[in-house]
């Protein structure tokens, strides 16, 4: 049974029309204007040290109180616990990821508020440009049965190596419970993003390598990293659960892993700033059906040559 492409095209075009109206409220910059606007936003939010972190280490951590009030973290954790009881989850205990919830964005407005939080989104813009799209809205729940997650780079299995210094994929992790060694914290290899290469096979489980750094950080923190950064996670040995909201993003030219333009609603568009539509992929040129590309859509696409578009 095939999908009714006529109905799908009509519904998608309707959402794109709404997105275009929102766009007119606050058009995204191109070319040199994108760099100027981003620099101003970074200064307004005092994020300069985090930009330095990206360049040297390939990741940065926003401390509690920077991305959002702690109440939002607690609300997200509560919502995820409820979703885990009624929705299908994925990944056996041996995977290293833990219990995984996919495509959570349409399930609760709390995820929208996390997505639109200004400081993390500004850092995503630095890595992927103003037209970055949300690729996943995923919840990870690790209990004491979950082993270590192998060290890897998110560009692996997505882009051929050697990778460009420019990131095409970036992860934003909302730390909903304390990260400690015993709790199965994320670990990273600082500066590995500069190699532009996948993790060698002999280092995939080298969590105790002297170059690896364990991120022992409190609940309420947010981690953002470059797609080429080598990272993994320790096994959880403590009782209880480690919970994380994971929001990977991609550049405008890259296809997201989850089809948000197919599940976004008019209400979601209405209650969010204009850039929400871009994150949903509604201001990108593709995809299209037999009616072909909408030329007005391409007006909203990057065309000035800046990596910050």
Go through each PLM region and give its residues.
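Conserved double-stranded beta-helix
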Residues: 20, 195-200, 204-224, 228-229, ...
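Short connector loops at helix/strand junctions that flank enzyme active sites
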Residues: 134, 146-148, 167-169, 240-242
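Short, solvent-exposed loop/turn segments at secondary-structure junctions
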Residues: 66-69, 139-142, 179-181, 193-194, ...
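Non-heme Fe(II)-dependent double-stranded beta-helix
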Residues: 2-161
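Short hydrophobic-aromatic micro-motifs
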Residues: 61-62, 172, 223-225
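Catalytic core of non-heme Fe(II) oxygenases with the double-stranded beta-helix
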Residues: 148-215, 254-263
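A structural signal for short, well-ordered beta-strand segments
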Residues: 136-139, 172-174, 245-249
């Amino acid at each position: 049974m095939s999908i009714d492409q006529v109905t799908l095209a009509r519904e998608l075009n309707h959402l794109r029309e709404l997105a275009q109206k929102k766009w007119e409220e606050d058009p995204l910059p191109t070319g040199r204007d994108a760099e100027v606007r981003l620099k101003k936003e970074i200064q307004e939010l005092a994020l300069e040290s985090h930009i330095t972190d990206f360049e040297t280490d390939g990741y940065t951590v926003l401390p509690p109180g920077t991305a959002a009030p702690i109440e939002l973290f607690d609300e997200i954790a509560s919502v995820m616990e409820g979703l885990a009881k009624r929705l299908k989850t994925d990944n056996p205990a041996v995977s290293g990821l833990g219990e995984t919830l996919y495509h959570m964005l349409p399930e609760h407005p709390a995820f929208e508020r996390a997505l639109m939080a200004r400081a993390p989104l500004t850092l995503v813009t630095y890595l992927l440009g103003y037209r970055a799209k949300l690729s996943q809205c995923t919840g990870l729940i690790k209990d004491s049965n979950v082993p270590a997650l192998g060290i890897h780079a998110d560009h692996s299995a997505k882009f051929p190596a050697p990778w460009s210094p420019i990131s095409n994929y970036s992860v934003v992790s909302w730390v909903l419970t304390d990260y400690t060694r015993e709790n199965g914290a994320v670990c990273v290899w600082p500066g590995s993003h500069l190699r532009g290469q996948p993790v060698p096979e002999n280092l995939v489980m080298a969590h105790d390598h002297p170059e690896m750094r364990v991120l022992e950080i409190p609940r309420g923190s947010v981690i953002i990293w470059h797609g080429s950064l080598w990272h993994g996670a320790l096994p959880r040995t403590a009782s209880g659960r480690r919970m994380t909201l994971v929001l990977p993003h991609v550049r405008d030219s890259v296809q997201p892993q989850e089809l948000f333009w197919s599940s976004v609603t008019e209400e979601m568009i209405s209650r969010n700033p204009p850039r929400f539509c871009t994150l949903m992929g509604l201001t990108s040129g593709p995809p299209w059906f037999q009616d072909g590309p909408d030329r007005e859509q391409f007006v909203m696409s990057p065309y000035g040559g800046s990596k910050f578009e």
